[in-house]
Amino acid sequence: QTMSYSIDIYRGRIEPTESLLDFALFVGFFPQLVAGPIVRARDFLAQLATDDRTPIDTGRALRLILGGLFKKIVIADVLATELVDGVFANPGGATGLETLLAIYGYALQIYGDFSGYSDIAIGIALLLGFRFSDNFDQPYRAASLQEFWRRWHISLSSWLRDYLYVSLGGSRRGRLLTYRNLLITMLLGGLWHGAGWTFVVWGALHGAGLVVERWVRERRGSGTAPSAMGRVVRTVATFHLVCLGWVFFRAVDLERAGEVLAALGGSWTSAPSLDWRVVVILVVGATAQFLPRGLTDPWWSWLGRSPVVVQAVVVVVAIVGMDVLGPDGVAPFIYFQF
């Protein structure tokens, strides 16, 4: 975040702020400081500079905060404790079907964990009078890796594009250098998460996938939009390629990642014994990726206009419900380690 401020000043895109207090607030603004979303100086400082008071949308703030807590406690932590952690700790003891469900489960776990934190941060910022852009946009409905990165951790992907990919030359220096720039950008994006081979492989998979997609588009030309069935096929293929990357992202090392992938060849005849919450989360979590955006906005808008007593009751009921449905204790957010 601070790097983008310095680079934007160097490029002449913004003027340095003359207020030390404004700069300190930009650098240390606590809601999104640890795990995003990454806020650009031009967006944050502009909100400090205006004299207009930002109306606080209580309904949207409650939706973001309570929704983020639900994603973390009920979705991410339940999937982790009841399915994902056990399989990734001992893949040799899991059936092929159980391993596949654990991989799917981790895809939903990391989405619930990370987007949940982003939603909470954006909601708290909104209560403090700051408006931040959404950081996730139903990423698993993407029909290509390029679209996935327009929907996943949007603030990071745009940061990598603007400050790494463009700085390397972007797509202005010919086809081969464009491929190189894509690959380097994603490799560095992987290393940003940690100096381990699992993150290198994760970044390389996404980089190679983006290169192949670009090569195919260049060979075929812009053409016409894919049919409905074509988009379904592309969406399924993209999701499974992303899941392959998540195996390396989640595994403690390359050997464990190989064991997880090898476990897919195990028995597929015996049904795994799953907690009912896991089954519901897998079904509902997958379905939610394709629901229309803003489906529940009218209800939250009504809540925002309701008396404080009504809002307090909803908050208490939601928290108690999450405590009942969630596991014992709350694990740290995944992105706190990066």
Model-found features: residue ranges?
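Membrane-embedded transmembrane alpha-helical bundles that form the catalytic cores
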Residues: 2-337
